[in-house]
Amino acid sequence: MGACSSKAQHQTRDPEPREQQAAQEQKSTGPSGAPNDAPAPAEAERKMSGSSATAPKGEMPTASTGTPEQQQQQQQQQQQQQEQQQHPEHQQSEKQQQHGEEQQQERKPSQQQQNEEAAAPHKHGGERKVQKAIKQQEDTQAEDARLLGHLEKREKTPSDLSLIRDSLSTNLVCSSLNDAEVEALANAVEFFTFKKGDVVTKQGESGSYFFIVHSGEFEVIVNDKVVNKILTGQAFGEISLIHNSARTATIKTLSEDAALWGVQRQVFRETLKQLSSRNFAENRQFLASVKFFEMLTEAQKNVITNALVVQSFQPGQAIVKEGEKGDVLYILKSGKALVSIKNKEVRVLQRGEYFGERALLYDEPRSATITAEEPTVCVSIGRDLLDRVLGNLQHVLFRNIMLEALQQSKVFASFPTEQLSRLIGSVVVKDYPENYIILDRENRTRASASALFSAQGVRFFFVLEGEVSVFAYKDKSSSSSSSSSSSSSSSSAEGEMELHLIDTLKRGQAFGDEYVLSPNKPFAHCVKSNGPTKLALLTASALTATLGGQDIDETLDYNNKLAITKKMYIFRYLSEQQTQTLIKAFKTVRYTQGESIIREGEIGSRFFIIKLGEVVILKGEKRVRTLGRHDYFGERALLHDERRSATVAANSPEVDLWVVDKDVFLQIVKGPMLTHLEERIRMQDTKVEFKDLNVVRVVGRGTFGTVKLVQHIPTQMRYALKCVSRKSVVALNQQDHIRLEREIMAENDHPFIIRLVRTFRDKEFLYFLTELVTGGELYDAIRKLGLLGRYQAQFYLASIVLAIEYLHERNIAYRDLKPENILLDSQGYVKLIDFGCAKKMQGRAYTLVGTPHYMAPEVILGKGYTLTADTWAFGVCLYEFMCGPLPFGNDAEDQLEIFRDILAGKLIFPHYVTDQDAINLMKRLLCRLPEVRIGCSINGYKDIKEHAFFSDFDWDRLAGRDLSPPLLPKGEIYAEDAEEGGLDIEEDEGIELEDEYEWDKDF
């Protein structure tokens, strides 16, 4: 097989694709972009209950003013009004400007009119120009070299700093910066001087500088025509703060002497990155010092850290006042604060100390006044925001305590998280005073404990707050000789029995394993509180209800079977219903030592899991190995009519096996899921060598070359082969991306994600051999379908959510989610492709990467982002599915317009979109504050799956391939209608690589 030119992913494209991947090596911004015009989640839901969620002419209702988010929104609107003055290089003429404003205001209604005039159905995107994904940095050497000759040293005066600060504060990209960040950037700008006629920027030339006019006048020239002037205090080159791109105008000096302040994009973003990283680390450290949060998980602490708000106070300014209602926790980051009660000074708070923690739990007035003694900076979080990103704090803390205790329990340790959550949800929480007998033998309790504990009573309990002593009863006569000298015994006796202290349990500990394992065993201990105590009690009836009527042994057996089957691909992605039915179909069979279980050469029809005992595997008379408890064998017999490759015999006096027959399995798993499993197992079984591949045709072209359909000659299996030119990779400085792409693809194993079979390399190319996906792009499918209905949108969005959820569970950010990067398989189910932008996240990322229309605000800005960026793209896709155009920048002519619309544009819904559940979900996904974006809280994707939009959708049947896809592909669909045989290729034996190609040694 010879060399092909290539693309870094298995993709097919339109003749004029709107695509491709991206990896702009630049820093991007932070978790707190400007808030959306969409109401915050709670507000949005409130508005949904009104008469209408859409205002006249497709306008979305505006949220009322007052909250910090809404105040930021108003500031954004004011900034938009100032933009024409602040960025005059984008002005052309007054008439053109007014026309542009009209277009922006009527953008969505104009789309509606087009749709109404069309016969039907509504079309996706219309004639919009969609930007390609940002891939690599443009060369700015020419501009950089020219500007170097104008650079001068200058000490900034107070008036200089004031001018710079004012300009930065009104800049859209800088709108989310705090005072410290603006100050750092003001100190980072450089001074440039110019003479009349000097050129600052050239139209079409790539640039990386953002400028503020210090003095003089400059003219704006577009296509050799002067269209505007730039005066002192005005700025230009805003797009350069986001990424290097071609200048849209030439800027030339008009004055005899003129000067600019300028900052390079790399300096700008590196400054923000350093500040953001340092602030996050500091805030995380401060949060760790709050004892109140010590029972939170690391992930929960990170969520809170991302949501912390920085607040500054001047000397003498009250931070909180005694008697006022409190709902905010404050941590001092710098400065000092005086605590006073009833006008009496009590103490002084220093850096790292905190106050107001009770305000997060209880509706009670402040117990003291706290006043800044000097300039003081605090980080804070309010109860409302905390509830939105984490949930009710007390419930979260208690749940964490119980979850950790269950995971350490000998009985519950093997329970899956979902089962543990159900157990936690069934407990009863009760408070007890000091020295209270909470439980006694045979479940005798004080009368105030209520009839709750009648029948089988309490079987298990957790200590949430306080401390309890646990006593055992012993026969007094048999232990009298030792009890007098035992410090752990109690002198109180009941009849001929006396109490002996056996344990003292504190917060986070639990008791009752023996009573869970023996449901009918009478409670034989005494539990007493050592102080005010809060317990969570699990009763026998609650335990039975939670376990679905099964006893604990049956549940443990079920969990063991579940854990074992989920290790195998053949069972891993069955639906929950299919899995439950399969596990219940297992029967127990016993064999005695020496008895053959299966015989070499016979046709297999059973799958086995070892419950107890040991088996030996024999090839002929040769002993190969032994298998023990919870090992398994024979799974291939469920899918294939194959002869057994070995004999398996019992190797202990008794061997108990869980067994399922093939005919039972085929009654449970059938149709599309069975076909999918057969194809996947066959693909995994095939041992592919490069020399055995035959090129059939080209199916796609991209940045690095082509994608080819190839056939494996020995088995006739077909695959897609992406052929990546090493020279192109090196020229575009993409070595790390290609290597990471391979690493991530090799780890992926999900039915809705493209499967990498293996990789090859030779002197000129790298090769990705993947499964062949023949149904075409989702991008084309939604254009065939027209505007998607509720079920169609549910099907595609839910499939995408499951694929991205799988990646996020492995801490992988996809970062270029869009319909072009999703293919349909022959059954109409989705396959996520193109991992050229994916990244294994460790902390926060700062790289600007992805396709502009689908970028989250925090990616565009410069202060870091996490996995939340992918969740924003869910909202863009859903909007495109159901509304037609893109939500932001649909009619934009350049990337700056797209970015401006994403950061500050209104989210407007066409009049023909009437599904209020869908509208609400879009608003919550397209929330500019990632901390409160649905799917980004500590609940993760559970909040999306349980949203009202999916209330009538069966996620389980989707996973089991038991739903009808919106579009069933007819035949095979490829973008590239290439001639048979693809490109002419030369044979290559894989000659030794030169040293400079060491980066691709893993291929």
From Swiss-Prot:
A lipid is attached at G2 (N-myristoyl glycine). The gene is PKG. It catalyses: L-seryl-[protein] + ATP = O-phospho-L-seryl-[protein] + ADP + H(+); L-threonyl-[protein] + ATP = O-phospho-L-threonyl-[protein] + ADP + H(+). One of its GO terms (molecular function) is ATP binding. Monomer. It comes from Eimeria tenella (Coccidian parasite). This is cGMP-dependent protein kinase. SMART domains: cNMP, S_TKc. Residues 693-950 form the Protein kinase domain. Residues 1-141 are annotated as: Disordered. Residues 173-289 are annotated as: cNMP-binding domain 1.
